[in-house]
């Protein structure tokens, strides 16, 4: 039920969009002059494709405790409560850069705004299950899955950074 609740909020509706998080990306794209069709039909970067394949494999082939640990830590990456000493989670830090360096407002970057807040709830959503079930001999593999997921996330982010460096100014 918790997984379905999480996916419902990401794909269907939550406090930030009546149409799911893709709608937030489309709205944010308008702020930078990207049309909805360009977003929907975008060819993924190789690093993005590899990361999505890795996460897909993790969630379909690994034991559920490892899958859950691997996916939960991606929510932690956006949790301002956990990363306040670093300036906040990934979405908050990116939003601050967009606002400071390019003059955007929170309203113009709804995907970043939503993820700077929604992922706090998502960070907590599965912890009781991990605390109960990722114990004993299941603890170390769950921790390793979380570490692997962080590596996948770093690869994904690096791919975006490399692509951004190629954009002519």
Where are these regions (language model features)?
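Non-heme di-metal
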Residues: 1-169
